[in-house]
UniProtKB/Swiss-Prot annotation:
Primary gene name: lysS
Protein's organism: Clostridium perfringens (strain 13 / Type A)
One annotated Gene Ontology cellular component of this protein: cytosol
Name of the molecule in the record: Lysine--tRNA ligase
Pfam families in UniProt: tRNA-synt_2, tRNA_anti-codon
InterPro entries, per the entry: Aa-tRNA-synt_II, aa-tRNA-synth_II, aa-tRNA-synth_II/BPL/LPL, Lys-tRNA-ligase_II, Lys-tRNA-ligase_II_N, Lys-tRNA-synth_II_C, NA-bd_OB-fold, NA-bd_OB_tRNA
Catalysed transformations (reactions): tRNA(Lys) + L-lysine + ATP = L-lysyl-tRNA(Lys) + AMP + diphosphate
Keywords in alphabetical order: Aminoacyl-tRNA synthetase, ATP-binding, Cytoplasm, Ligase, Magnesium, Metal-binding, Nucleotide-binding, Protein biosynthesis
UniProt: Mg(2+) 2 binding residues: E418
Enzyme class, broadest EC rank: ligase
Principal subcellular localization: cytoplasm
One Gene Ontology term of the molecular function aspect: magnesium ion binding
Length: 501
């Protein structure tokens, strides 16, 4: 016996009784000249929704529907069955008088999960359900694996994420979530396109991982014999396009960060970044709050949504609060009174704050930010712009007009979670180089999420970038709120999973 034959034999031994029975049915169909895998195309005339929505027009007329067989009921001379397609499901009425004895017998052998095409007349049953009175049908794909038990579906979260296709088949609300995700993405593009933004594509592979403070994925380009990074943000390339003369640009796509997995984080995620010449962070606040309101109205019909039992109101304007005021409100510490790094370090020690470098190297601004994360972040339930971040943690941002310890940067928070990040973009190449050099020192202290120096970006900045506002939004997190999903994995079709052994 060859190795291939041994492997096939071992695989067959692992099949369940139901799987073996389904494979036997397939063999019988093939021997009878009815191989479902020989079907190449189905001339479907209507979806389930088409039939139901246009019943008055279609009543008594012939249609051809197709979908997955989800239920069968009845014995003897009549069988009722439900076919599921993307919009929903349609009931089939199969009667011996209409299809013949042999055909009815054949239909009864079909398994739940099989794909069927059926032709027949549209009518309503005595119970008032729009149905198709079948005159002919065809098995167009044989399901060799049984679906999860009807009334329980696929409930184990780990299995749901690993077998998303089965999750969608058995849990209609999951399908609805991803349809809504598509609608949300479409509405975002629509909003920006209507404002004159140009959608662009920039590299995913880059020799520098820039534009954000994050740990990158590293790969190797064999032909060039260089290490490259999967992008952690699109920022630097998009700013180079502003230098080139494009005045309003955006990109929606995948970013990659080699970090942990949680209900809020997936290493591969969808984000949008947009940049507008001659604008500042105030303009970005206006764009953010009005775009989300537009999307909510478009997709949900209201700017108010319910998330985990709490009503969230996205109606503009959102609350604005400085980081200093937030720390004063939630931690009871007034940083206007803190005059030195040493004073801030003493507070950090008292509060047991942890940093990725020695405490004596930590600055006042870094302590302020950490205090907000510890005491204030989870308090911002309604949509809020946290504005004016310390300069030390905002290396790509212009300094605050009138207060050079801070920058014109904001992050948007909803339900205690960051959903966006925006700047009045730093366009002074001399200051930008100084900031990058400081970030290089941070890497020496052990902060592997500090920014890398990108000389190509610096060259572009030296060519000249006009005053610019920039905004980045985590699409997956926004979709969580608009679909009332508790985990980011619930809004990503195939989230990152540890391989099964």
């Amino acid at each position: 016996m060859s190795n291939e034959e041994i492997n096939i034999h071992e695989a067959e031994e692992q099949l369940s009784e139901q799987e073996m029975l389904r494979r036997q049915k397939l063999v019988e169909l093939q021997e009878a000249g009815k191989d479902p895998f020989d079907v190449y195309k189905v001339e479907r005339t209507h979806s389930s929704a088409d039939v139901k929505d246009n019943f008055e027009e279609l009543e008594g007329k012939e249609v051809k529907v197709a979908g997955r067989l989800m239920s069968k009921r009845g014995q003897g001379k009549v069988v009722f069955a439900d076919l599921a397609d993307l919009p929903g499901k349609i009931q089939l009425f199969i009667k011996i008088d209409n299809v013949g004895e042999e055909a009815l017998k054949e239909f009864k052998t079909f398994d739940l999960g099989d794909w069927v095409a059926a032709t027949g007349e549209v009518f309503k049953t005595k119970m008032g359900e729009v149905s198709v009175k079948v005159t002919s049908f065809e098995l167009i794909c044989k399901s060799l694996k049984p679906l999860p038990e009807k009334w329980h579906g696929l409930k184990d979260p780990d299995l749901r994420y690993r077998q998303r296709e089965v999750d969608i088949i058995t849990n209609p609300e999951v399908k609805d979530t991803f349809i809504k995700r598509s609608q949300i993405v479409k509405a975002i593009r629509e909003f920006l396109d209507n404002r004159g933004f140009l959608e662009v594509d920039t590299p995913i592979l880059s020799p520098i991982a820039g534009g954000a403070a994050a740990r990158p994925f590293i790969t190797h380009h064999n032909a060039l014999d260089i290490d490259m990074y999967l992008r952690i943000a699109t920022e630097l390339y998009l700013k180079r396009l502003i230098v080139a003369g494009f005045e309003k640009v955006y990109e929606m796509g995948k970013n990659f960060r080699n970090e942990g997995v949680s209900v809020r984080h997936n290493p591969e995620f969808t984000a949008i970044e947009l940049y507008e010449a001659y604008a500042d962070y105030n303009d970005m606040m206006e764009i953010m709050e009005n775009m989300i309101a537009y999307v909510c109205e478009k997709v949900n019909g209201s700017t108010k949504v319910t998330y985990e039992g709490t009503e969230i109101d996205f109606t503009p304007p959102w609350r604005r609060i400085t980081m200093v005021d937030a720390v004063k409100e939630f931690a009871g510490i007034d940083f206007n009174e803190i005059k030195s790094d040493e004073e801030a370090q003493a507070i950090a020690k008292e509060k047991n704050l942890e940093f990725p470098k020695p405490l004596d190297k930590v600055t006042k601004g870094e302590v302020l930010n950490m205090l907000f994360e510890e005491y204030g972040e989870d308090k911002l339930i309604q949509p809020t712009f946290l504005i004016d971040y310390p300069v030390e943690i905002s290396p790509l941002t212009k300094k605050k007009r009138g207060n050079e310890m801070f920058t014109e940067r904001f992050e948007g928070f909803v339900y205690g979670r960051e959903v966006c990040n925006a700047y009045s973009e730093l366009n002074d190449p001399i200051v930008q180089r100084e900031r990058f050099e400081q970030q290089a020192r941070e890497r020496e202290y052990g902060d592997d999420e500090a920014y890398m120096l990108d000389e190509e970006f610096m060259s572009a900045l030296e060519t000249g970038m006009p005053p610019t506002g920039g905004l980045g939004i985590g699409i997956d997190r926004m979709i969580m709120f608009l679909t009332d999903s508790s985990s980011i994995r619930d809004v990503i079709l195939f989230p990152t999973m540890k391989p099964q052994k």
